[in-house]
Regions:
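Glycine/proline-enriched, intrinsically flexible loops and inter-domain linkers
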Residues: 1-248
Length: 248
């Protein structure tokens, strides 16, 4: 399975120069497998769970990549929070799209997702079998890479209790521990400074990217008080981005 989805991604990139309007940028291209085993101390029952999590899909020649979906060939779905929490003595303490995880482009990649597994009362064994923690999904035709994946133990704790996990590991958890599973964003298609400013504004207002990212990577300057595009400042910022890109 892991090999198949990565080969698909590699083939798409290889075919892209000859089929530019039919190929998407890179996706998460992995199963993103999260599993845990836990013994409920109240009744002695043993529980185990396995999930394959979604991530950002690559952008295409005419549209953005979908946010937090399963990629080509995976044929799985995310388990609903209510289902997981009703069957296992744990909590999904956070489930969200990851802001600024898209691969910037004329059409942006889809956002990755964050799912935090919290074990309030019982020790547990957690398994990460995943990838993309070194390099995020690549963009094409001037598009940029999506944010890479992160796997973090106790993400909201002090530095002493927080640690970054590798993409392939088994970790023993104590009561109160949390594992944050953060999948990558999809790659972008085309230069970011060619993106429609209205689309950038929509992403900012929708909480998918922040104002600074809009300015620095897309060259779109948005007034933070009115949430309107500053056209003169945007024209200047985009000219500077194009000049910088051409000089490199």
């Amino acid at each position: 399975w892991e090999t198949q989805v990565r080969i698909n991604d590699m083939l798409f990139k290889a075919f892209a120069p000859g089929m530019p309007t039919k190929i998407a940028a890179s996706t998460k291209a992995m199963m993103a497998q999260a599993g845990f085993g836990i013994i409920d101390r109240e009744n002695g029952e043993y529980h185990c769970n396995y999930e394959a999590l979604a991530g950002g899909y690559g952008a295409r020649a005419t549209s953005d990549g979908p946010d937090a979906v399963q990629q080509h060939g995976q044929n799985t779905e995310n388990a609903p929070v209510e289902e997981v929490e009703s069957h296992f003595p744990m909590r999904v303490s956070r489930l969200s799209l990851i802001e600024d995880s898209e691969g910037p482009g004329k059409f942006r990649g889809g956002l990755g997702m964050r799912r935090d597994y919290h074990f309030p009362n019982d020790p547990a064994t957690f398994t990460v079998l995943s990838d993309r923690d070194l390099v995020g999904p690549q963009g094409i035709f001037g598009g940029m890479a999506g944010r890479k994946a992160y796997y973090i133990l106790n993400p909201d704790s002090s530095n002493e209790e927080q640690s970054e996990l590798t993409s392939k590991c088994v970790v023993e958890l104590k009561p109160g521990d949390t594992v944050s599973f953060q999948t990558p964003g999809g790659g972008g298609y085309g230069p970011p400074e060619e993106r429609d400013p209205a689309a950038v504004l929509k992403d900012v207002v929708g909480g998918k990217i922040n104002h600074q990212r809009a300015r620095d990577l897309y060259g779109v300057v948005i007034d933070e008080e009115t949430n309107e595009v500053d056209e003169p400042a945007t024209n200047k910022a985009r000219t500077e981005l194009i000049t910088s890109r051409n000089s490199n």
